[in-house]
Curated annotation (Swiss-Prot):
GO terms for molecular function: transmembrane transporter activity. Keywords: Cell inner membrane, Cell membrane, Membrane, Transmembrane, Transmembrane helix, Transport. CDD domains: MFS_MdtG_MDR_like. This is Multidrug resistance protein MdtG. Pfam families: MFS_1, Sugar_tr. Belongs to the major facilitator superfamily. DHA1 family. MdtG (TC 2.A.1.2.20) subfamily. It is a multi-pass membrane protein. It comes from Salmonella choleraesuis (strain SC-B67).
Length: 404
């Protein structure tokens, strides 16, 4: 029996990759609450300079991740996904360790760029599970896996803030590096993959990858959907605290209220993603995708008219429940429309679009709020998501007509 014929316990791999995604999500978000403070500690002074450098060190990670993802995706298709998980976890652990030793802002900026170049654990975890899980359980498995990163991202800022208050800023980077090294060890000892390496000559070129897709236009529309999902999420991030302050008036605990309202969509997504993923396996992920996009539009519009923070919190909770279905549905449709041979690259291209959305979303939100006010951001974002819903519906309708 060849290595590729040995059965894989995909449920164990799903459990271990979930833990890995949880630890990675937590590790990334551990340092997020105090990034501007660390930038200031590295010698940046002045309001405008601090804003500029904080924005740079935040966005450069996503920018370099967008550039590097296709390369790592191609390497994953050649060498296997487990080795990419190991490479990512260990590489990020080393970079985080070095961040805690940075002496000036330029060193820190370069290390943030390296973090983007060496990242990709969650991307490769999705590709690994997508190629191992039975197709009829893809929605449930990918939905469940997505809750790992979401859970970590929810707990990370809270833990990071507490650790920074007790131990200072630099030690948090060392703790984060330790968390990522634990992720490396879990992957090394417990994840199993039967993968026969492919030589560079045997690898499909980009044109051949596109030609091998069942529906290239649909796959492109799914990439665009991923980008717009992240644009919609990111556009609200820069103005959320300020909008909450406008709604709440003079209250002493504005930071707590803002933090709670920022986190409720993640909690809702955590609850909804596996259930909606399983429903998608029954009725089709395309139906889940379109309905979730339409619900998102219907929830974004009233956010521009709310009068209290609690009204905003309720709408954001419902929005999070709908959003919890979006990326797993996109990933499931990508699985349906590609082969295992090119899964790494398809997921990496999707990650690049996601990273571009992470960069452009906050820029769009900040620009709109500066010109037209906070409330306009929600209306414009709703319009962008509505366009995406129509575009996605049209792409899926064409696929259905082509099949018929």
């Amino acid at each position: 029996m060849s290595p590729s014929d040995v059965p894989i316990n995909w449920k164990r791999n799903l459990t271990v990759t979930w833990l890995g995604c949880f630890l990675t999500g937590a590790a990334f978000s551990l340092v997020m609450p105090f990034l501007p403070l660390y930038v200031e500690q590295l010698g940046v002074t002045g309001h405008s300079a601090l804003n500029m450098w904080s924005g740079l060190v935040f966005s450069i990670t996503f920018l370099f991740s967008a550039i590097a993802s296709p390369f790592w995706g191609g390497l994953a298709d050649r060498k296997g996904r487990k080795i990419m998980l190991l490479r990512s976890a260990l590489g990020m652990a080393i970079v985080m360790l070095l961040m805690g030793m940075a002496q000036n802002i330029w060193q820190f900026l370069i290390l943030r760029a390296l973090l983007g170049l060496l990242g990709g654990f969650i991307l490769n975890a999705n590709a690994l599970i997508a190629t191992q899980v039975p197709r009829h359980k893809s929605g449930w498995a990918l939905g469940t896996l997505s809750t790992g990163g979401v859970s970590g991202a929810l707990l990370g800022p809270l833990a990071g803030g507490l650790l920074a208050d007790h131990y200072g800023l630099r030690p948090v980077f060392f703790i984060t590096a330790s968390v990522l090294f634990i992720c490396f060890l879990l992957t090394f000892f417990f994840i199993r993959e039967n993968f026969l390496p492919v030589s560079k000559k045997e690898m499909l070129h980009v044109r051949e990858v596109v030609a091998s897709l069942k529906n290239p236009r649909l796959v492109l529309s799914l990439f665009v959907t991923t980008l717009i999902i992240q644009v919609a999420t990111g556009s609200i991030a820069p103005i959320l605290t300020l909008y909450v302050r406008e709604l709440a008036g003079n209250v002493s605990n504005i930071a707590f209220i803002s933090g709670m309202i920022a986190s409720v969509p993640g909690v809702a997504a955590l609850l909804s993603a596996p259930r909606l993923g399983k429903l998608g396996d029954r009725i089709g992920p395309e139906k889940i995708l379109i309905v979730a996009l339409i619900i998102s539009v219907l929830l974004l519009i009233p956010m521009s008219f709310v009068q209290t923070p609690w009204q905003l919190a309720l709408l954001r909770f419902l929005l999070g429940a709908a959003d919890g279905a979006l990326l797993p549905a996109v990933q499931t449709l990508l699985v349906y429309n590609s082969t295992n041979q090119i899964a790494g690259r398809i997921f990496s291209y999707n990650q690049s679009f996601r990273d571009i959305g992470n960069v452009t979303g906050p820029l769009m939100g900040a620009a709109i709020s500066a010109s037209y006010g906070f409330r306009a951001v929600f209306c414009v974002t709703a319009g962008v998501v509505l366009f995406n819903a129509i575009y996605s519906w049209n792409s899926l309708r064409r696929r259905r007509l082509a099949i018929e």
